[in-house]
Amino acid sequence: MSVKVRLGIMMFLQFFVWGVFFVTMGTYLSQLFKGEEGINKIIGNSYATQTWAALFAPLVVGFLGDRLMNKEHLNGLLHLLGAGLLWWVSTLTDSTMIFWALLTFFICYMPTLALVNTITFQNVDNIETEFPKIRLWGTIGWIVAGLTIAESFFGLFELPILPGIESGGTTSAQFQVAAVASAIYGFYSFTLPASPPEGKGKPVDIMQILGFDSLKLMRNPSYLVFAVCSFLICIPLAFYYARTGEFVGAMHFGDRTGAYMAWGQVSEIFFMALVPFFLTRLGVKKMLLVGMLAWALRYALFGLMPSNMAVVMVGILLHGVCYDFFFVTGQLYTDRVAPKEMRTSAQALVGLLTYGAGMLVGNYVLGWWGDSIGLDPSTKEGWLEGAEKFWLMPAGFAVVVSVIFFLTFWDKKHDSKTGDVGELEADPAVS
């Protein structure tokens, strides 16, 4: 088996483990804690475990993976530990215990997102041409995970591939499936090509590992605006990842929610191919602005027409524009602005501001907001009554951030419509 095929399988399993439960976890929690006070905060806190773990992930990778042990071995150990933790989560019924078990799992899982990238980088001849093709298998893994747990092919017809399991997306079975996949993946990781630590013997620089040495980029007023707006836009972003699955499930799709949500990743693949085309014609500022406004439009559709299935599907299909136009363009802009010796730390800093700090704040805000408006997420009637208030708040927030960005961001040097786009990569992780 070729190295590229082995790495493709690695990427597939990496995102299958995450995707098989993350989209539908909110639905399970809303049923498990139905009628309990503070149910929205319970859901928000549970999703916040992923973002808390994202803040610590660079330390694990930067110290263990870069200095102490082979990355494929570390990846295997972390996923074997994760398998046990996921199975444990499936047995819990106390919200506090679920929080700590999920947090421990994500502390194991989040560092592996960086590990699989560096394993790939160390074992391919041409990173720019080969990595995007290998990374695509991660998105495919996320899509297949949604179809698997929903036991439906994009909602078009039934796909019963989990013997003995019914309604996997609304029960603890989703964690058990993820646990089995994580265990298989853990053992498989030990067969991956050797990826020894490249920084062995070098001093540990915590500031560099966290990307804080790239803070000097903030001296560029345009980049400062980009960084602040990236943090702010990820506050409403958290609403999508934490609550859309249970919202569309209660309103329209039920057990098939994972299959319908997978259309968002299909859209992501489609618009990923179009990013270079649009970027050369619109430039950085307009691309980022379109991505921000797409979030506002999606939430407005959810809030104003929640009972219209076609409109809800449009909101899901907007994922490609929401994610690719903002995050991929932002990654490219950062790569252009940062000096060569600072590009890795600059990307790490953007990750901390967005997937870490921004979504962390968002997960707590969505829990507080849901309870403040009295949202009952466990029933269709509850969502129908509370959808407008719940979704229009992040829609309005996204519009405000977009206006701030439009009025304050301008970088003529890097907003060229004819610049070299090059190869792009993205992390639909939380896709």
What are these regions (language model features)?
Residues M1, L192-V228, E425-D427:
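Juxtamembrane intracellular "pre-TM" segments in multi-pass secondary transporters
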Residues M1-A54, S222-Y260, F327:
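Helix-loop boundary and gating motifs at the non-cytosolic
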Residues R6, V89-T91, A181-P193, F390-L424, ...:
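Multi-pass alpha-helical transporter architecture, strongest
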Residues F12, F16, L85, V89, ...:
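Hydrophobic core of transmembrane alpha-helices in multi-pass small-molecule transporters
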Residues G44-F63, A262-L274:
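Central cavity-lining transmembrane alpha-helices of secondary-active solute carriers
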Residues F56-T93:
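Conserved MFS/SLC helix-loop-helix module at the cytosolic interface between two early adjacent transmembrane helices
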Residues H73-W87, K286-L301:
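Structural signature of the two symmetry-related core transmembrane helices
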Residues E151-V180, W368-A398:
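A membrane-interface helix-boundary motif in multi-pass transporters
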